[in-house]
Amino acid sequence: MANRHMRVGVLGSGQVGQRLAAGFRSRGHEVMIGSRNPAKPELVQWLSGEGAGIEAGTFAAAAAHGELAVLAVLGNAAEQAIAEAGPENFSGKVVIDAMNPLDFSGGFPPKLSIAGEDSLGERVQRALPDARVVKAFNTIGSPYFVDPTFSDGHPTMLIAGDNEDAKRAVADVLADFGWSQTVDIGGIEGSRELEAICIAWVKIGGARGAWDHGFKLLVG
């Protein structure tokens, strides 16, 4: 999937969405980034620089544009963004969920606003029953989404989703983005663990005072 030209719709124009949109564009794909306000000055400025060659549109336009869709809004805005985009615009598509349901209301470090017997990934799949949702990109900082390299080696990307073909497609995207190791942890309910790993990642960053770290699976 990743080795052919694709139309990709990225919903979310913050740091995560911009980094993923630029990554897909760098691999030759036709990318639209979706925003509630596609004309906002900071997005227009980004499109004239790092985002050159990427179109901007509404959430609905980006979702309709993509053969592959990426959800990269703030976790607490995810369900509203899906409603604005129109669930029908995701029908039959692979949807990458790159979000975490972080709650900073109690200060730092954040907590998960969804936990226990549910997760944001599962809510996304329920909101998009005709799409094939794969959780990915949520356990690493956005500067390392594409061509990730650390002084100690290459990190592992953990993914979860119910559809095997969709997970293979996302693994292809990751390989094209320079990830040498992708590990499938199972169904979309694995988002519970992946979202919790994000909290660990944030706590480590807070303790270190730096965000240049990732996780790697080592097998003995």
Positions of PLM-derived features:
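General beta-strand structural signal in soluble alpha/beta enzymes
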Residues: 56, 132-138, 182-185
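Rossmann-fold NAD(P)-binding glycine/threonine-rich loop
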Residues: 99-149
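Active-site-lining helix/loop region of Rossmann-like oxidoreductase modules
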Residues: 155-220
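Rossmann-like NAD(P)-binding element
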Residues: 50-96, 100-108
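A glycine-biased structural micro-motif
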Residues: 5, 65, 91-92, 130-133
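Glycine-rich beta-alpha junction loops
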Residues: 77, 99-102, 138-141, 163, ...
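N-terminal beta-loop-helix "entrance" segment that forms/cooperates
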Residues: 40-51, 144
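NAD(P)+-binding Rossmann beta1-loop-alpha1 motif at the extreme N-terminus of oxidoreductases
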Residues: 1-45
